[in-house]
Amino acid sequence: MKYDLIIIGGGPAGYTAAFEAAGNGLKTCLIEKRDLGGTCLNRGCIPTKTLVHTADLYRTVKGDTPDLKCADTAVDYEGLNAKKENIILQLRGGIEKMLKAGKIDVIHAKATMKDAHTVRAGEELLETENILLCTGSEPAMIPISGIECEGVITSDDILRDLPQMEDLIIIGGGVIGCEIAGIYEAFGTKVTVIEALDNLLPGMDSEAGRSLAMVFKKRGIDVHCKTKAVSISKDEKLTLAYEEKGETKTVSADHILIAAGRKAVTDVFECEAPSMERGRFTVNERFETSIPHIYAAGDIVYGYPQLAHTAMAMAVNAVCAIRNVPFKRDLSVVPSGVYTCPEIASAGISEKEAAEKGMQAISGKANTLANARSLIAESERGFIKVTAEKETGKLLGTVMMCERATDLIQEAALAIERGMTVSELLQVIHGHPTFSEVFVSALEAAEKKI
C-alpha cells in the first residue's frame, strides 16, 4: 500500500499531523516505537504538571497559616505515581480513539528510512509520497566523569516512577531542573541546583530567573549559578565536585538529576540524512528538509523552541505545505511557561531584545503585592512586565511571574500576535478581583512612558 504521508513519531507533532492530514483526505500512516503521546504525555509535560499540582497542594496544607490546620499530612508516593499513570493512560486512550476514528494506520515499531519514499517499520517496507519526521528529543547528558554512577538519573527516570529522596542535586537550572526542584522541595527533600550560566532559566527574562532564585533560597533550596559541574563519585552517597568563584567544592546526595537540556532523536536513516545544525534538522519556510519530500516538525527542528504546542503548530503547517494550502498557524509569537510556584510565563520579546533589533521600546511593570487575589492566595511576591514600542504603543512582549501565569500569558500572546497597542488593551475591562488585574497595572505603567 502506498501512502500520501508517513509520519515517524507519535508525540504531539506526530499525532497532530496525522489528524490534520487524514482529516483533509491524505492516506496517512503513523509509526511510533514506544507509547503514543511521546515525551510530553509519557515522560514530560503531563506527568510533571501532575506532580506540580500535588506539590502545590502539599505546600499549602503543610504551611503554617491562620486559617488552615492539617495534622499528619504526608505524601503518598505510591498513590501519586498511580494518579500520574491513570492520567497518562486516560489521555493516551483519547489519542488512540481519535486515530482510529480518523482511519489512520498506526504501527508500533522502530522506523527507519531507506529513501525519501520508503520507510521500514520493523520488518515491513512501506511506500509513501511524503515523510514527516516527528521523532522528538531525549535528555542530553554532560561529559563529566562519574556520569555512569548508579543514582545519576534523568527526567525520564524521575517521571517514570517518582522516587522518595532525602536529598537531590540537580545539574541544570533550566525549565526541567527548576520544575523538579520545586516539586521535591515541597515534598521535604533537600535540593541543590547547579547552573553554569548567570541565572536560573537562562532562556527567559533575567529578572524572572533572579526572582525565582530568591524564592528558591527562601524555601531552603541551595542555588549555585555561574557554577561548573566537574565530576561525580560514589561512596555511601553520590558526591558532585563543582567549581564556583574559582574554588572547587563538593555536595552529596542520594541522587543527581542531569537536567542539562535535550537532544534531538535522529537515528532513523538507512540513507543519507538531511542537513543539520547543532544536532537538529534545518528546514525551509515549508518545513521541508534539504531532501525533497522529507519534512520535519517538533523538537528535532533547528531554530524553534522545544515546546509541545510549538511542535503541534509546526506539524499543522507542515501538512499544509504538503497539501499546498496556506498555513493555519502563526509561529511568530509562541508563549512559554514554567510550572514553578509561582508560575513564570513569557511571550514576545523583552526591552533588551527590542533594542538589539533596533527598536525604541519601553517597559511597564507591576508587582503582585497590592493585588487582592494574590493576597488571598498568600502568593509569593511576583510581577508582570510588559514591553511596548515607544512610538506606536504596540505591545511587543510580556513576562509574568505570578499565580496562573501560564494561563494569563495567553491574553498577552493574542495581543502581540494581533498587533494590539497598550491603549487598546486598556480599553478592555478586566474582572475584579482577578490575578489578571496585575497585567492591567503593568499596561498602565507602560502607557505613562509612551
Regions found by a protein language model. Give the residues of each.
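FAD-site-proximal beta/loop scaffold in flavoenzymes
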Residues: 148-164, 250-322
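Rossmann-like NAD(P)H-binding beta-loop-alpha module
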Residues: 162-204
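Core beta-strand elements of the Rossmann-like FAD/NAD(P) dinucleotide-binding domain
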Residues: 1-3, 122-130, 246-255, 290
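Glycine-rich flavin
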Residues: 2-3, 19-26, 31-164, 192, ...
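Beta1/beta-strand and adjacent pyrophosphate-binding region of the FAD-binding site
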Residues: 1-13, 165-174
